[in-house]
């Protein structure tokens, strides 16, 4: 099983990509314009002691804590690759990618192939993975109870499932 955490998920949503996805999914032009207005009308300022910067536009992300933010995030990650051998369980920006087989080498091969596909998709959609919160776990049903679970770090930046024992 792979546990993948998307880095700054709500802050990094690529606006043009989200709007493009909404168009491909058949959202009405009127709704897309409303969402565009919602996303583009945000700005920020920086205060250092008594000095306040001029307003700057926020060019990516969706407002956290809003009702619409999680729904827009779900739309944005719609289309994450799926295969017959590999399954996904997602909650917000956390994803569990899992498979099962009696042979560990099949599991590792399927997950490795999936990681390569996922890496391309993540790059295309400008999504980064938080490597420090992502891991690989292999449960061997034939092993003794004390040695069934192994946790490894994964590297989606290289597209490799790094299994270091």
Question: Language-model segments: what does each one mean?
Answer:
Residues 50, 113, 129-164:
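Short, conserved micro-motifs composed of acidic
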Residues 54, 70-99:
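Active-site palm subdomain of RNA-directed nucleic acid polymerases
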Residues 39, 77, 115:
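Short amphipathic alpha-helical/adjacent loop interface patches that line ligand
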């Amino acid at each position: 099983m792979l546990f993948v955490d998307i880095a700054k998920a709500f802050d990094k949503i690529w606006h043009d990509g989200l709007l493009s996805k909404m168009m491909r999914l058949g959202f009405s032009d009127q709704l897309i314009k409303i969402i565009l207005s919602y996303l583009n009308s945000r700005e920020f300022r920086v205060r250092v002691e008594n000095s306040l910067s001029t307003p700057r536009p926020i060019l990516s992300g969706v407002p956290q804590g809003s009702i619409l933010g999680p729904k827009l995030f779900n739309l944005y990650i719609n289309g994450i690759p799926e295969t017959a051998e590999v399954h996904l369980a997602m909650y917000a920006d956390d994803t569990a990618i899992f498979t099962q087989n009696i042979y560990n080498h099949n599991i590792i091969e399927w997950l490795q192939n999936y990681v390569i596909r996922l890496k391309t998709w993540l790059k295309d959609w400008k999504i980064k993975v938080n490597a420090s919160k992502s891991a690989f776990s292999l449960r061997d049903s034939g092993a003794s109870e004390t040695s069934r679970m192994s946790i490894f770090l994964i590297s989606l930046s290289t597209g490799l499932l790094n299994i270091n024992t």
